[in-house]
Amino acid sequence: SGEGEIPTDKMTYRTSPTTGDRVSLLGYGCMRWPLKPSPDGNGEVIDQDAVNGLVDYAIAHGVNYFDTSPAYVQGFSEKATGIALSRHPRDKYFIATKLSNFSPDTWSREASLRMYHKSFTELQVDYIDYMLLHGIGMGGMDALKGRYLDNGMLDFLIKEREAGRIRNLGFSYHGDIEVYDYLLSRHDEIKWDFVQIQLNYVDWKHAKETNTRNTDAEYLYGELAKRGIPSIIMEPLLGGRLSKLNDNLVARLKQRRPE
């Protein structure tokens, strides 16, 4: 166990250096909730009973961090996640969600505020534990300015943190490294509570081989460590691809370690 780890028989926890939150090392991504045929036969809808069961199982086994977004599961992830989690005491889980105003028609302050306030309604909460600017770097500096800077939304989110409606403010990163570096350069002013990056054994030094827009996690993590900003990891298995090795790679690994 490293510094800040609390081993238990079910889960390892990390204590946030900024808030003291005791967060499970394994979080639950709510981007792909199970679906079932729609009652009217037109497409699919979220299987709420299945979601409830998955959330119950996760909490029973020590998971207490749930990551969602207004953009996930055709816009219905937050509602399904809120229904499932609201059946548990509020102090038993942390909710992470995002201001996912990707489309230019949601860049206005009014549209962004509607999205932000809707998250509270859908999640059935009066505060959000971890709020992220979603996917900064996608669209470069122009998108960052349109989504968060020119409309005053970053300043608004900082004030919401001061008011206690946001407990931790951070961002998730894909794409243009200029945007990542710019936001970190403002850390002394903004005081980022955490940053979410893509990190796994491929992306550590070979990120561009899986996606040319990405930057090696070694650099991303290093920049956070230099500033003492806690990191949250997404895609530890590269969207599941690292859990399904092809026969050639399995053979090579077995040559190295037959056991």
What residue spans do the PLM features occupy?
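Structural preference for beta-strand elements that scaffold enzyme active sites
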Residues: T15, V23-G27, N64-Y65, K92-A96, ...
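Structural motif corresponding to the early beta-alpha repeats
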Residues: H88-R109, L113, H134-G137
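Short, acidic/polar
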Residues: N42-A58, W107-Q124, G175-R186
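N-terminal binding-site loop/beta-alpha segment at the start of enzyme catalytic domains
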Residues: S1-Y93, D126, N151, F156, ...
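Short amphipathic alpha-helices and their capping/turn segments at secondary-structure boundaries
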Residues: D9-D21, G82-S86, S112-L123, Y180-H187, ...
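Active-site groove signature of glycoside hydrolases
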Residues: F120-K145
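Beta/alpha (TIM)-barrel catalytic core signal, keyed to glycine-rich beta->alpha loops juxtaposed to Asp/Glu
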Residues: K10, I136-E259
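Active-site mouth loops of central-metabolism enzymes
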Residues: M31-D49, K98-A111, D142-K145, G175, ...
